[in-house]
Every structure is written in C-alpha cells, then in structure tokens.
C-alpha cells in the first residue's frame, strides 16, 4: 500500500494564510505560525467591527438628526415622538441624510411635527 503524502494540502493551507497576511509587518507576513495567529486575530476584529459599525453609524445618524432638530427648536426625542404621531415612517439613516443634504425638506418635516406636537399638548 502506498503511503499518503499530504504536502500539497499543507502547502495550499499555508499559502492561503500567507495570502491573507499580505501587508502585515515583520515575520507576520511570511512566517506561517506567526501569520496564522495574526490572521485569526484580524478575522476576529473584522467580525466584531462589522457589528460595531452598525452601532457607530446609528449613533452618528442620531447626533446629526438631533443637531438639525435643535436648530429648529426641537430635541431629538420630541422630534422622533412627533414623527411617530404624524405617522412618518422614515428611518434614522434617511432622516440624517435629509438633515445634512436636504435642509428645506427637513424643515418642512420639522414644521409638520411641531404642529402635531402643539396640537397634542
């Protein structure tokens, strides 16, 4: 019975890891054992930060909406409550986009919300 040699599989696996480690500093880019550790850690960071990015953007959108709403005399919380009362179903990403790039449309939205809030008070 012929003996099984696994050199090609090992070589392919090493090559895959070293390809992912391209651009790393020092031996992390060309020494397999070190590269494997760095690549695994990098993939952990990537996994974690894909989730953190969603949180970060939501926070950014809220900050932008709050700033734009306060320019018109409303707080973020009151503005969002007013939107719910009016029945406007826009997400924070779109509202932040409006607040930054479409100020006149956002002002109309604020006006609508303000009138509804005054009506309910």
UniProtKB/Swiss-Prot annotation:
GO terms for biological process: ribosomal large subunit assembly; translation. Keywords: Ribonucleoprotein, Ribosomal protein, RNA-binding, rRNA-binding. Pfam families: Ribosomal_L20. GO terms for cellular component: ribonucleoprotein complex; ribosome. InterPro entries: Ribosomal_bL20, RIBOSOMAL_L20_CS, Ribosomal_protein_bL20_C. CDD domains: Ribosomal_L20. One of its GO terms (molecular function) is rRNA binding. The keyword Ribonucleoprotein applies. Binds directly to 23S ribosomal RNA and is necessary for the in vitro assembly process of the 50S ribosomal subunit. It is not involved in the protein synthesizing functions of that subunit. HAMAP family: Ribosomal_bL20. This is Large ribosomal subunit protein bL20. It comes from Wolbachia pipientis subsp. Culex pipiens (strain wPip). The gene is rplT.
């Amino acid at each position: 019975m012929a003996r099984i040699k696994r050199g090609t599989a090992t070589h392919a696996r090493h090559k895959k890891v070293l390809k992912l480690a391209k651009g790393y500093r020092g031996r992390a880019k060309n020494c397999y054992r070190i590269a494997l550790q760095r690549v695994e850690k990098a993939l952990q960071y990537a996994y974690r930060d894909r989730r953190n990015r969603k949180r970060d953007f939501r926070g950014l959108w809220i900050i932008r909406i709050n700033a734009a709403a306060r320019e018109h005399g409303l707080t973020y919380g009151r503005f969002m409550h007013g939107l719910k009362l009016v029945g406007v179903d826009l997400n924070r990403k779109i509202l932040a986009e409006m607040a930054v790039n479409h100020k006149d449309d956002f002002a109309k939205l604020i006006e609508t919300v303000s009138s509804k809030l005054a009506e309910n008070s």
